[in-house]
């Protein structure tokens, strides 16, 4: 399971280096294979270990091609999906269309989300964090059934 936010850089070829603490689990459990796609609700990328992506793909296969929203979701997630493997230095190339979608240039944030990672432009990540903080402050957590008993 992946957690934590790491500041990373894109090199001139559009590659990122996955932080060392994630490399061994990715290699041992997933043979260093990932699938990168877009987040349909935010301007970031989603990086799934291959076994986790297979679960997502199975759910996508159940969506209807005759329902416009379901078809659009399939089109976005599958159309942008790119399989990759970490090289010996833990690097992976981000295809240009994916970099453009997430406005990635030089500085990025890799954010663990248990079964996957999010990859954000650093400035967009900072903005998202502030928006999330304000949304949580303005929410009546007790009114949300799943959050009513949530305690840290």
Curated annotation (Swiss-Prot):
Q: Its Gene Ontology molecular function terms?
A: DNA-binding transcription factor activity; transcription cis-regulatory region binding
- Subunit composition? Forms oligomers.
UniProt-listed PANTHER family: TRANSCRIPTIONAL REGULATOR MRAZ
Question: According to its record, what are the GO cellular component terms?
Answer: cytoplasm; nucleoid
In Swiss-Prot or TrEMBL terms, this protein is called Transcriptional regulator MraZ
Domain SpoVT-AbrB residue range list: 5-52, 81-124
Q: Which gene encodes it?
A: mraZ
Supply the Gene3D superfamilies for this chain.
Answer: Transcriptional regulator MraZ domain (3.40.1550.20)
Entry-linked InterPro entries: MraZ, MraZ_C, MraZ_dom, MraZ_N, MraZ_sf, SpoVT-AbrB_dom, SpoVT-AbrB_sf
Q: Which BP terms does GO give this entry?
A: negative regulation of DNA-templated transcription initiation
Q: Which PROSITE patterns match?
A: SPOVT_ABRB
Superkingdom of the source? Bacteria
**Where's it found, cell-wise?**
Cytoplasm, Nucleoid
A Pfam family this chain is assigned to:
MraZ
Keywords, ordered alphabetically: Cytoplasm, DNA-binding, Repeat, Transcription, Transcription regulation
The record's comment on protein family reads: Belongs to the MraZ family.
Question: CDD domains attached here?
Answer: MraZ_C, MraZ_N
State where it is primarily located: cytoplasm
């Amino acid at each position: 399971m992946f957690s934590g936010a790491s500041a990373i850089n894109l090199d001139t070829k559009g590659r990122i280096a996955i932080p060392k603490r994630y490399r061994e689990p990715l290699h041992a459990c997933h043979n260093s294979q990932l699938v990168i796609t877009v987040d349909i609700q935010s301007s970031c990328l989603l990086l799934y270990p291959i076994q986790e992506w297979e679960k997502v793909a199975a759910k996508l296969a159940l969506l209807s091609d005759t329902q416009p929203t379901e078809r659009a979701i399939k089109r976005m997630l599958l159309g942008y999906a790119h399989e990759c493997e970490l090289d010996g230095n833990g690097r992976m190339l981000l295809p240009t269309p994916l970099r453009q979608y997430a406005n990635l240039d030089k500085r990025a944030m890799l954010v663990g989300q248990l079964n996957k990672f999010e990859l954000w432009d650093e400035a967009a990540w900072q903005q998202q964090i502030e928006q999330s903080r304000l949304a949580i402050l303005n929410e009546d957590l007790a009114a949300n059934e799943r959050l009513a008993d949530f305690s840290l």
